[in-house]
Each structure stands twice: as C-alpha cells, then as structure tokens.
Amino acid sequence: MCPRHRHSCRQVLASLLLLAAFSGGPPLSGAGSTSADATTPFLRDALQGFDRWDADHDGTLVLREIDLAIASPEVTAGQAAAAVALRRVAGNRRKPVTSFTRESIRALATVARVDDSPAWQEDSGSARSATLETCYADALEKITSTPRDLFIDGQPRLAGCRQGRLGSCFSLAPLTALVNRDPQAVVRLFRAEEDGSITVLLGGGATPVTIAPLTDGELALTSSTGGNGVWIALYEKAVGQFRAAGKAGATPSTPLATVTRGGSAGTMISVLTGNAIRRFSCAPWREPLADSATQAARLGELRSLLRSGTADRRLMTAGTSATTRKVPGLARKHAYAVLGYDAATDLVTVRDPHGQTFEPAGETGLENGYAVREGIFRVPVPEIVQFMSGFAFQRETPASPAKHADPSVATDAGASGDE
C-alpha cells in the first residue's frame, strides 16, 4: 500500500474512534456510516474553509490554525461560525478534540457534545447539550444580528453584560466594576482612529493598545452587552493583544487565544487603572487548624477594606480557585466584580461576569447558593470568605511598571489569583 493510502486509512480510523468516543458505542465497521449530510450548513462551511485554514497543508487542523482563522478578517459569516464551532469543541472540559481532519469533522458534526456551559447552568439544570451544528447556528446568529457600534446608548450598561466563550473573567471583573462605578470612565477608555482601528487606553491612559476591528469569528466568541455595543468585546481583544505583546520570545498567539488562558483579576485592576492594588487572602478559612481569633481579626480587616473601598469608589474584585468551596450557582476558578459593601447589613454585593439569574433550591446560603439576578448577588461577610480565595482592592497610589506589565500570573484559566 502506498504511503498516501496508509495516511488516508489512518485518518478514517481516527475519525471512527472519535465517533465511538462521543457516541458511547463501539467503533463502526465502515467509513461510509460516519458521514453526516454534507449539505448541512456547518459541514458545508467547515469543509469549504478547511484548506484555507490548514496553514501547513498537512490535512489536519490544529488549535492554532483554528485560532488564526477566527482572527482573520477574511474568514466571514458561515465560515467564521464554523471555525468558532470547531474552537468550542476543541475547548471541551471532558472530551477536548485537539485536531481535526475532513473525515473527523464529518464524523463529529452531529454527535460531538460541547460541554462549555457555565457552572451556574449545570447547577440549575439549564445547561444545553450543544453539537457542532448548534454551535455553528449560535455563532452565525450572533454574527448576523449584532450591531458593530462601539456604544449604542452613548455609554455602557451593566445590565446585559454577559461573558462569552472565553476564559476572560479576570479581565471582565474589573471592567464591570468600573461600569458600575463610572460608565463614562469606560467610554473614555476607547478612541476610534481614522483608519478604522480602535485604541483602548489601559493603565489609566498611559498604555494605549491599538487593535483592528472585531472579525466575525471574534465577535462570535467574545462577551456581549445585550445590544449596548461591542465595547466589551473590543476590551477583551485589547487585553489579549496587550498580554501577547508582553511575552517576549513566546510563540505568537492571537489576542483571543491569549486572553482565554486566564489571569489575575487583581492584577487587571492595575492594568486597567494604572494604580497599585491591595490583596486580601481567604486562606485562614481553608486551613483546618486556623483559630477563631485569627479569623475574627481577619474579618475585621476585610470589613475595613470593603468599607473604605466602597466609600472611596475604588475598584474591587474577588475570585474562587479550583480548591475553594463549591457553592451552587457559582463557579470555581472564576473572577467576580465586587460592587459594594453595606456595613449595616454586613452584606457584600458581587457580580458574576456571566450575568446569570439563579434561584437557590432552598434557603439562601452556602449549601443552596444565593439568589442571583443578572449576575448580582449579596453575601454576608462571614460566608463569602468561605468560598472566595481572595479579594483585590484598588489603591490610590500608582502601580510600578513591573506590577501591571503582565496580568498573567500562575493561575488556572479564568481564575482570579487574588490571594
């Protein structure tokens, strides 16, 4: 058998094994039975775009090639939606697919299940099992229906902000805290250039980052505002470009591929504002031998930080880690905006970048979760320290360049790292 035929046979066998893995059954006996209808919109656009996306022409699409297709302004409409669908199944938590051939795309088109739903959807039972076809349809609907205006109502609104398909909560938590504090300050972050590019003024205006307009694929993956403009998506792209530029010697990456790797929400406060931060760790509530006197003193310290941060209208964030307590309706390895603190009730007001609504199945608290409305929920101070890993508070003093040059600390994707 010639090498070309052996390569084709290996591709078909790999496709059959992928199909069996996703369908839960044994490998099928014939290649023909793995073929989905080639006239379906997803298959049509994915297969038409395949050769152009396959940069090294080896007959296989890897994640970097898909990311480059999503970042390309030449990949539009249905083909952009198809690339986004492949990117989503590649990012599966339980069964990620690291590469695609034409045969495997046909095999996976209707059987691959995408498990990238936020934790709150899984907790509420509202998680939707998506296929490549439904991911394609969702992406195409967003591409065709979203206005590309920077701000539609003159200024940003917190209501309607929803994290997209990226692990970008670390960048969204400080941004949405700023929207809550001063919407016009967010407007001042953006400057439209004559050539159509957009400059995002990070570091309190000292660090301008100029980016190209969103591609169709980028629009489909990034966060949304509920019809309030694409400012939040442009910010995510700018953060990704800023981070990629700060990694000398690293393998080149697209802005969205960089931003989805996660980072520190606290460090992002410095990146956004140019100010230093103060961190507060909740580690004493995860240590079995921690004494109550230490915990009581630390609660007093946290209340003082929350009280002054609220009074001075400074940005505040909090975050969970992979090892913090799981609370129904909320995610681990996730960053949150802290919107304020009420000393009279001892309640902290927090916003999840996902912007969800969640109703606890029982009494509100650590066991059943908290009532969440458009991402906003309130938690007593003695309870919030039991599931957050830490907090970060904006300070009035400027940050040193080394402190806000790169927000990518050693954290899990989407984690806040605020300890």
What feature does the model see in each segment?
Residues 34-57, 62-419:
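Structured alpha-helical subdomains that flank or immediately precede key functional sites
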Residues 3, 23-24, 252, 281:
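Compositionally biased, intrinsically disordered/low-complexity regions enriched for serine, proline
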